[in-house]
Amino acid sequence: MEPAAGTPGPLIMNNKQPQPPPPPPPATAQPPPGAPRTAGGLLPGGKAREFNRNQRKDSEGYSESPDLEFEYADTDKWAAELSELYSYTEGPEFLMNRKCFEEDFRMHVTDKKWTELDTNQHRTHAMRLLDGLEVTAREKRLKVARAILYVAQGTFGECSSEAEVQSWMRYNTFLLLEVGTFNALVELLNMEIDNSAACSSAVRKPAISLADSTDLRVLLNIMYLIVETVHQECEGDKAEWRTMRQTFRAELGSPLYNNEPFAIMLFGMVTKFCSGHAPHFPMKKVLLLLWKTVLCTLGGFEELQSMKAEKRAILGLPPLPEDSIKVIRNMRAASPPASASDLIEQQQKRGRREHKALIKQDNLDAFNERDPYKADDSREEEEENDDDNSLEGETFPLERDEVMPPPLQHPQTDRLTCPKGLPWAPKVREKDIEMFLESSRSKFIGYTLGSDTNTVVGLPRPIHESIKTLKQHKYTSIAEVQAQMEEEYLRSPLSGGEEEVEQVPAETLYQGLLPSLPQYMIALLKILLAAAPTSKAKTDSINILADVLPEEMPTTVLQSMKLGVDVNRHKEVIVKAISAVLLLLLKHFKLNHVYQFEYMAQHLVFANCIPLILKFFNQNIMSYITAKNSISVLDYPHCVVHELPELTAESLEAGDNNQFCWRNLFSCINLLRILNKLTKWKHSRTMMLVVFKSAPILKRALKVKQAMMQLYVLKLLKVQTKYLGRQWRKSNMKTMSAIYQKVRHRLNDDWAYGNDLDARPWDFQAEECALRANIERFNARRYDRAHSNPDFLPVDNCLQSVLGQRVDLPEDFQMNYDLWLEREVFSKPISWEELLQ
């Protein structure tokens, strides 16, 4: 049977009819010449409505914009990550670095180029450069640092192509790492951080520019290139390079630098910058290096997935129902939902209908006539060939504004395509089974059995079947197991024994972050706020442009345009780095221990992270994702290999020819994932989403046709649908359909209605306070040794061991020992009888 024309689309798949290309949108609000005058009645009613709808679709790009070919990964391509390190204002410094290297190189090697030397000669010269970093004169030290930076940049003056530069970069970087450059740079960086003279002069300056951070920028550039290059694995890597990579990762995550991991030093730079004590710090480079350090030491998202599977096996939990990374990669984007103006217009038209109820019934009859999920065998082959999973085109049947026309004649092959199944396996928590059994027992028996999930005596057969289905899909998370174990430790501290804490990189990093974690979170969010495109320039906001503004401000229009692009790009890179750091830390801490994650998440919430992210999305998100804030001819390594063409206003405006900006889409997805992490299973935080009116903001973000971004937007909408009221759900049926199709289902989750217990009034403050108490108990038990209960500490009663302990006495005490003996021992009477008794 052929499907009826206009068969409902959102809950089921849309007809694949060949559509003619849409006409271009009109340039003005006036109708184009020859346009049908619907008001004058020159077209029949149905045609006029169809024309209006097409016009509206075209003007909004409604479902016509193509899917964005974006693949989410830990980082962008290596070349893009290298180019984002440098601002365009730093362009002249490439030649300065080359000059410093060649002056020094010619003093020792006169007849050969760097690329013509053998490995031993390379190593000798690298060690000679390293020795030059130990001189006391700042100018000489800076020249040597620039020479090392030129080596790390791939000695581009002797290369003829970008690929050759990148090849020499890898070789030179591993060479520099081998001779111990990174540790020497860490010491120099520490010295620059504590350079009070530079800090005080920067504080007094009214305007800070690139020149104020020269030393720091050179050091951070070299360190970033080492971390980024060593972290990237290539097929042609030598065996010793792989060994060096593993050693470097271990060292970077170990407390070798001032008894703390290197990342803590960078976090310290961030807080010092935000406090106003060091406004000259090049924050973009610090944040990029911090992100790559965390990524290198803790591991990326695929590594995290394998660690999660491994940890589940250790805890005796069943394997994950699916690989979430693969599922998301195979998803297709849905069409953007209709805008509010469309919905209002449709409702007004419906209000004027005389036979509204009848029409709705007709639509529902047509909808029920043919169940699209009952796919017959004849359609299987076609479904296998068609992987377009998107919800396109048609509005939901209840949203229609006209009686359904008679079926049109379609070709035989043009069938209604149906999804094979939902992408995610449903999950059920133990708590959900308990609640279901409790309500069933109250209803059928009249009493409850608490947390007993096995006794089903007296319950009818259908309830037995329901419980069986729920238990089949039961999912126990690592976090639940960790929380139960923590309760056991607190309940029985003596019989529980000493907890064995595995010193993995995430644990070491958490221990380093713990004393000042609230300050670190506030500092990162302050910078994120300053870099957000929606934030207005305020006098009290921090200046994040210290490492992009030149000493002399531009004098021509072209220079101003170039600086404008540079500043926007600079802010985008900062947002990218902060969003990636926060997401990585949240995910790794959640895997390591749930209360480490909750501690960080709670401080993010207290620092207003939720409204900040919503404020970020309260902009034209399509414009942000398709922004062209880059000048490809000035990107490294292109700019050091090719002749620089003359820049024009047109070339600056054109930007690159990419469909979207990778870093901006990456940032948006990261921020949505952070928002999901903060609000998941937290009713108080979900209510913050409702209070801050996030639904229209998030709904606008659905216009971006990228499956992963849409998934996280739909997740955030799903958790608050029960609070948004019946009218919102009725007006947003297409969004509800997309949630049903793309977001994981909880079998007895009444998310689409307001009947759930969770939707009733809740003591939000008590919820956060209880969580905070659990976190504080965890931190005190595991990390706060000073406040341990003395009754549970081991006692040494052996006289020999006490007398054998070495006691370091202060020098002044040793000099006045005779005086102390006379005053404290000999002059005081001792009652020997009482002492011996």
UniProtKB/Swiss-Prot annotation:
GO molecular-function terms, A-Z: protein-macromolecule adaptor activity
Q: Where is the composition biased (Acidic residues)?
A: 378-391
Which residues are recorded as modified (N-acetylmethionine)? M1
Q: Name one Pfam family in it.
A: DUF3402
- Tell me the domain of life: Eukaryota
* Amino acid composition bias (Basic and acidic residues), ranges on this chain: 47-60, 356-377
Q: Name one GO cellular component term.
A: FAR/SIN/STRIPAK complex
What assembly does the database describe for this protein? Answer: Part of the core of STRIPAK complexes composed of PP2A catalytic and scaffolding subunits, the striatins (PP2A regulatory subunits), the striatin-associated proteins MOB4, STRIP1 and STRIP2, PDCD10 and members of the STE20 kinases, such as STK24 and STK26. The STRIPAK complex can be extended by adapter proteins such as SLMAP:SIKE1, CTTNBP2 or CTTNBP2NL. Interacts with CDC42BPB. Interacts with CTTNBP2NL.
Q: What is this protein called?
A: Striatin-interacting protein 1
Q: What is the lineage of its organism?
A: Eukaryota, Metazoa, Chordata, Craniata, Vertebrata
- The coding gene here is STRIP1
